[in-house]
Amino acid sequence: KPFAAAKGAPNVLLIMTDDVGFAASSTFGGAIPTPTLDKLAKTGLRYNTFHTTALCSPTRAALLTGRNHHTNATGVITEMGTGYPGYNSLMPKSSGSLGEILKQNGYNTAWFGKNHNVPDWQTSQAGPFDLWPTALGFERFYGFIGGDTDQWHPAIYDGTNPVEAPNDPNYHFDADLADHAIAWIRQQNSLAPDKPFFAYYTPGLTHAPHHAPKEWIAKFKGKFDMGWDKLREQTLARQIQLGVVPAGTKLTPRPKAIPSWESRNADEKKLYAHMMEVYAGSLAFVDYNIGRVIAAVEE
């Protein structure tokens, strides 16, 4: 039975970025400036022994429910689900979800961005839709279903209905997600100011394909020409200085499957350095749009 939210119940904004390594953001000593995340860390808590599964669906199922991914039947990504217990991708209703729990306790709820927890064979318009966000306690869903999407021509769903992205050469999905999240947050403040909200914001730009705006990629021109071996050394030094890792921490040996930077020819170095620039531009743009959403909350 639903309850009214307690007086003074806080609004909640939960953000999950995608494929952002421990050493990527400046918040944890990385080479990519993420001022929004830096600010959150300075005014909140920063964990350095937090566990993820390093896979989309399992990590997301665990965060969404507070339960181990095998309990959620999501031991692997949904596309690789099997019929075995813990791996069939059919997240049980007994797991509950943050959306459902908070909705039952008087919150308005919305999800913006990536959902990689719908079983692969249930993602069409034939349904069923009982594992889509709108069936997990989220009154509003605007985003995409699956592991990735084109950022200029995304496969968007509003609820369970597919919608077309605007035919605009300046359109970008990451900015669009932020726009929709901001609009919803402002609506909550104007239409239901006495009712708390829970917004789950899950951008997917830092997962391939890395379709970052050109102007954001350009910000990192030449920043990674030193190569990945030197980058590892510089990152570890920053992490030690920040206290993210203990003093005296040593780099693990470079995996044999990854060649040394110096063994690459000039064309390969140019390509790989540009790939790093593109990823950096992607993360920086995500951080910028997260900042826009947080600013709307603070308003």
Model region roles, listed by residue range:
Residues K1-E299:
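Formylglycine-dependent sulfatase
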